[in-house]
Amino acid sequence: PFEVPPAWFAVVHPGIGVPTAGVFQAPELTRNSPPATIRGSLPAGWTSQPLPGRNDLEPVVRARHPEVAAALERLGRHGEARLTGSGACVYAAFADERAAARAAADVAAGWQGWAVAGLARSPLLARLERERRSRAGGAEG
């Protein structure tokens, strides 16, 4: 485990869906990216800015879906905008809730925007650990 600094995110949905299969089947998709690890891509003292890594799906989605490209550009006015997975949502990291909320509110008609707090720990992992402890405690009694 490693510490993840607190961060706020603006998440914007541009009102369309992006078929994941089509993105992964795209002939223009880069398929020879070097492997990366989360720990290896976080520089010492990282504070959520700039975001580490890259998303090889982003150029494909940007080229095929103008709405996503527009959302990336618009959110990019406020911070470093990135594609979530294969889309269609885009996001940017911010140091505080106010900046994230301001960016999330700057959406075009038909889009949705949210300001959300980043999580330092997966809720699913925490639940699995609680259940494991509970089962282990019950087995001893």
Protein language model features and the residues they cover:
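Short beta-strand->loop micro-motif that forms the acidic, two-metal-ion catalytic signature
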Residues: 89-95
